[in-house]
Amino acid sequence: MFNKSALIGSLLRRSFGTTNPLRQAIKNHQPNEMEKRFLVWSGKYKSQAEVPAFVSQDEMERVRNKMRIRLANIMIALTVIGCGIMVYSGKQAAKRGESVSKMNLEWHKQFNELKPEGGAAAPASTK
């Protein structure tokens, strides 16, 4: 059923081929300008001039993940702020006596007044 030598061979290849120190030692990724900014913003380097020409793929993955998380947190904060602004705006409109149903009734009233008197008009919907 099981081929022990194939199983052991695959486990050895998997453990030796992707060891963490070996993957970190291989610096084969050349960062572009945006990735250099990411490396600086994440605190890995002090300035873009200090960023080396090649960095490891693992380092770049970690930096991208940090930036993805930061961007998601910023979007969450902006969404919460936007919701708060909309709630405040709605409460102010309610104090002024504005409502969606009143705006809808006014629009229908204006629409019906502007409708031509001829028979070509669309039939009014009944509720």
UniProtKB/Swiss-Prot annotation:
InterPro entries in UniProt: DUF1075
Transmembrane region(s): 69-88
Subcellular location: Membrane
Membrane as UniProt keyword: yes
GO terms for cellular component: membrane
Keyword vocabulary terms for this entry: Membrane, Transmembrane, Transmembrane helix
Top-level division of the source organism's lineage: Eukaryota
Membrane topology: Single-pass membrane protein
One Pfam family linked to the record: DUF1075
Keyword Membrane: yes
Family note: Belongs to the UPF0389 family.
Protein name per the record: UPF0389 protein GA21628
